[in-house]
Amino acid sequence: MGDGVDELDVALVDALHLNPLASFEELGSVLEVAPVTAARRWRRLVSTGRAWVSSAPGPQLPLRAALFEAECQPGAASAVADEFAAIPQVFSVNITTGPDNLYAFVIAADQPLLAALVVDRLPAIAGLNRVQSALMTQLFSGTRWRLGGLSPDQVRAVTPEPAKAIPAHEFDEFDRELFLALQHDGRLSFRDLAAAVGRPEPTVRRRLGLLTHAGVLAFRTDFARVQAGWPTAVALKLSVTGSAVAAVGRTLVRYPETRFCVELTGGGAANIFVTMQLHNVSDLDPVIHRLSAEHPGVAVLDTRVVLRSLKSWGRLLGLDGRARDVVPVDLWAPV
């Protein structure tokens, strides 16, 4: 994972991918180190911007999301990307090769909010020649990309049991406060989280249990992928026969290179958007050949190499890929 990062750090990040809220006692047991060692290693990864845990929408939380692509005027891409990155509903921003040299992922609590973003606010930003958007309608992969640092036994040991499901819960202002506080650090202690939102600790503990068991709140672990030995990111737009979209999505999820894979609706011929993390650009051709062999009907419509990633799930990234600041992802913010 770059200078100063060793196999234990890789294994620690991998364990937290599988179980973002695992205690340091659990992590130490799985990794066969003292809990204090696991804690010290994690604090160093966080303080240097190499890894972080943050809140994320659970599978039962109602939301809408879109892919927004733009062709920027010459010399304007960086300024446009900075403006995009400052918007709380824009959770990822990347500058790429190709005519459409910027893409962003946008998320909102409902369709009117999403429309206000992709129809009104984003296209009005100065420096754009052309824009297009598509709804993201089915997520195949996005929060569980791993480094391969754990043995099968360690994977089984650290993977949590599925939470017992309870009836649906509608998000309120208290829930939003918790979600936004946990954007900064998803592993905040109950005491620190209670202080951040100004509520009693027992109340915070009960509400978090409710949100996670209701499936409206989840957590994700991210890392500086450039630092992890995967410096090359590519984005592909695929055209797949409608009946095969789910099968192709499931196949792509199995590939270790796949970082994010989603079904698109309303984006023209393209109906799958996938990003991949590679050691080198030359590694892409074997991946495409593998996919074509498994699904001969898949057509690759567009391939772009990411030149600069400015934002990833709310984290503002430096040129070295490390987190340098946070713009909390806020689905409910006014546009």
Regions found by a protein language model. Give the residues of each.
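A compositional/biophysical signature of low hydrophobicity enriched in polar/charged and small residues
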Residues: 1-335
